[in-house]
Design a protein with these regions (language model features):
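Short, structured motif recognition centered on aromatic/hydrophobic residues
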Residues: 2-7, 18, 29, 52-53
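Short acidic/glycine-enriched loop/turn segments that link adjacent beta-strands
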Residues: 45-48
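Short beta-strand-to-loop capping motifs
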Residues: 7-12, 54-58
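An amphipathic, aromatic/His-enriched active-site/gating alpha helix that lines ligand/cofactor pockets
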Residues: 20-37, 55-92
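Long, low-complexity, Ser/Thr/Gly/Pro-rich intrinsically disordered segments that act as flexible linkers
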Residues: 89-101
């Protein structure tokens, strides 16, 4: 299992738009075989940083998800919403592996 941890820098005047965008991604990740661990939106402290994470069984499974997502109307619409809405100023992705005891 691999987990992608995302760190977003947002336009703080467009947090509601980002929240809507995030709510749309969660079922898409699940639809295509991933586990979405949720989004964390600004509350106290920095008002422009959000986090999210999701997992897939392997990097190959994630790549298959990406290909299927590009062919999915809801996936394409969400990508377009982010482009036109400009609520995400930057995004960092870090891939992590779980340590089990």
């Amino acid at each position: 299992m691999i987990t992608c941890h995302l760190r977003y820098v947002l336009d703080p005047t467009k947090l509601k738009e980002f929240e809507h965008y995030g709510r749309l991604w969660i079922p898409l990740v699940r639809k295509f075989g991933g586990i979405h661990h949720g989004y964390l939106l600004p509350s106290e402290g920095a008002n422009n940083i959000a986090l999210a994470s999701f997992s897939f069984p392997s990097l190959a499974a994630y790549e298959a998800y990406r290909a299927r997502l590009r062919a999915d109307p809801a996936g394409r619409a969400n990508f377009e919403m982010a482009q036109t809405g400009r609520f995400i100023l930057s995004e960092e992705r870090t891939w992590l592996a779980r340590v089990e005891a």
